[in-house]
């Protein structure tokens, strides 16, 4: 059985755009998670999420692993981008859209063609 930290590392490694949040994109359980989802969704690319309310082990361990105390947490290409305030700020400056599009394009080109 893998440890919680190993599970977190695997989630981050396997999902180029990953949001740790309270609730789900369709039903966020806090305003900060809802704002982060709106900004991410507006970038027009798919992203993965982990509902920390359903994963108390991750909720307990991720702040220590990330050295970031709060949720949501956006991880892009293996790196912590930040929480709600940073995500919104980057979106307002146009930086989030660029980062998300570039990351999505990078990983799309690595996928084998479905045809």
Swiss-Prot record:
Protein name stated in the entry: Glutaredoxin 4
PANTHER family with a match to the protein in the record: GLUTAREDOXIN FAMILY MEMBER, MONOTHIOL GLUTAREDOXIN-S14, CHLOROPLASTIC
Location of the protein in the cell: Cytoplasm
Annotated Glutaredoxin domain residues: 5-107
One example GO MF annotation: metal ion binding
Binding site for glutathione: 22, 59, 71, 84-85
GO biological-process terms attached to the record: cell redox homeostasis; intracellular iron ion homeostasis; iron-sulfur cluster assembly
Residues holding [2Fe-2S] cluster: 30
Pfam families cross-referenced by the UniProt entry: Glutaredoxin
Presence of the UniProt keyword Mitochondrion in the record: no
Any one GO cellular component localisation term in the record: cytosol
Protein family according to the UniProt entry: Belongs to the glutaredoxin family. Monothiol subfamily.
Organism (species): Escherichia coli (strain K12)
Subunit (UniProt): Homodimer.
Known role: Monothiol glutaredoxin involved in the biogenesis of iron-sulfur clusters.
NCBIfam families cross-referenced by the UniProt entry: Grx4 family monothiol glutaredoxin, PRK10824.1
Keywords from the named record: 2Fe-2S, Cytoplasm, Iron, Iron-sulfur, Metal-binding, Redox-active center
Keyword Amino-acid biosynthesis attributed: no
InterPro entries in UniProt: Glutaredoxin (IPR002109), GRX_PICOT-like (IPR033658), Monothiol_GRX (IPR014434), Monothiol_GRX-rel (IPR004480), Thioredoxin-like_sf (IPR036249)
Principal location listed in the UniProt entry: cytoplasm
